[in-house]
Amino acid sequence: MIDREQVKKVAFLARLEISEQEQEMFTRQLGAILDYIAELQQVDTEGVPPTTRAIEVHNVVRPDALVVFEDREGILENAPERAEDFFKVPRIMED
């Protein structure tokens, strides 16, 4: 179980100012979270492969293909500033 002093220490380390009321609230909430974690640690996971998510996710990518865009000038007309056939953007890196 977590106590108020531990909550105050965590708040101090995180550079957070919390009121007495918040200290009490966080003590209860963090205590409940830690109790739940302790409960989860009792679950038998023998034979269960390690995983990072409940549902297996696979990236779906499309093959790269060159596509010629017919209305280049139409897009460039909307550019706030342009240099020849390119959008001109503010410099973000120094020389």
From Swiss-Prot:
Pfam families the UniProt entry points to: GatC (PF02686)
Superkingdom of the source species: Bacteria
Gene3D superfamilies xrefs: Glu-tRNAGln amidotransferase C subunit, N-terminal domain
Known catalytic reactions: L-glutamyl-tRNA(Gln) + L-glutamine + ATP + H2O = L-glutaminyl-tRNA(Gln) + L-glutamate + ADP + phosphate + H(+); L-aspartyl-tRNA(Asn) + L-glutamine + ATP + H2O = L-asparaginyl-tRNA(Asn) + L-glutamate + ADP + phosphate + 2 H(+)
Enzyme nomenclature, EC number: 6.3.5.-
A molecular-function term among this protein's GO annotations: glutaminyl-tRNA synthase (glutamine-hydrolyzing) activity
SUPFAM superfamilies: Glu-tRNAGln amidotransferase C subunit
InterPro entries: Asp/Glu-ADT_sf_sub_c, GatC
Top enzyme category: ligase
GO biological process: glutaminyl-tRNAGln biosynthesis via transamidation; regulation of translational fidelity; translation
Keyword tags: ATP-binding, Ligase, Nucleotide-binding, Protein biosynthesis
Subunit structure: Heterotrimer of A, B and C subunits.
Record function comment: Allows the formation of correctly charged Asn-tRNA(Asn) or Gln-tRNA(Gln) through the transamidation of misacylated Asp-tRNA(Asn) or Glu-tRNA(Gln) in organisms which lack either or both of asparaginyl-tRNA or glutaminyl-tRNA synthetases. The reaction takes place in the presence of glutamine and ATP through an activated phospho-Asp-tRNA(Asn) or phospho-Glu-tRNA(Gln).
Family (UniProt): Belongs to the GatC family.
Protein name: Aspartyl/glutamyl-tRNA(Asn/Gln) amidotransferase subunit C
Source organism (scientific name): Gloeobacter violaceus (strain ATCC 29082 / PCC 7421)
